[in-house]
Every structure is written in C-alpha cells, then in structure tokens.
From Swiss-Prot:
SMART domains: Cpn10 (SM00883)
Highest taxon above the source species: Bacteria
Organism: Corynebacterium efficiens (strain DSM 44549 / YS-314 / AJ 12310 / JCM 11189 / NBRC 100395)
Keyword presence, Aminoacyl-tRNA synthetase: no
Protein name (Swiss-Prot/TrEMBL): Co-chaperonin GroES
Subcellular locations according to the entry: Cytoplasm
Family matches, as PANTHER family: 10 KDA HEAT SHOCK PROTEIN (PTHR10772), CO-CHAPERONIN GROES (PTHR10772:SF58)
Length: 99
C-alpha cells in the first residue's frame, strides 16, 4: 500500500487505479485505442463517513487495501507526488472484489 498524506473527508475514498491488461489470455496485444477505461482500483485511504439527519456518523463499509469496482465516470482524478489517484464518493463504489 502506498503511504500517502491525503486524508479523504466524509464519505470520500482515495483509490489507485489498477491498470487494465495489455494482452489477452491468448497473448494478443490490445492496442490503446481498444482498451476500456479501467474500473478496478485499490483503496489507499478512506474518509470517516458522512453524518445522517440526527448528526450521527455513518461509517463506510470500505477499508484500506480493499480492491473495488467503481462507476466508469465517477470520481475526480488527482496527481500527488507524481502518482495518479482517483477520489471517489462512496456512492461511486459498486462492489468490493473478494480475493
């Protein structure tokens, strides 16, 4: 896991995108023009959760080092210390990949 000095607020999640495969299972190279935008990422940092109507904090089900699948066009791309990250809202996370 990367040691990053970025602490997400509320229900925000900082992830590092897992690069898509560049070859198929049979060994064919996939050209850049045919690659889909990756939707799998590793969680780097998680905010404390948002507050409900009663003022109580709702913690997130996601934790650091989880591998998640996120909405294709969700989040904000950021670059920190030369590394690219994506800052997502909890609602942009579609699933946790269990390995």
């Amino acid at each position: 896991m990367a040691n990053v000095n970025i602490k997400p607020l509320e229900d925000k999640i900082l992830v590092q995108i897992n690069e898509a495969e560049t070859t198929t299972a049979s060994g064919l190279v996939i050209p850049d023009s045919a690659k889909e935008k990756p939707q799998e990422a590793t969680v780097i940092a998680v905010g404390p959760g948002r507050f409900d109507e009663k003022g109580e904090r709702i913690p997130l089900d996601i934790k650091e080092d989880d591998v998640v699948i996120f909405s294709r066009y969700g989040g904000t791309e950021i670059k920190f210390d030369g590394v690219e990250y994506l800052l997502l809202s909890a609602r942009d996370i579609l699933a946790i990949v269990e390995k």
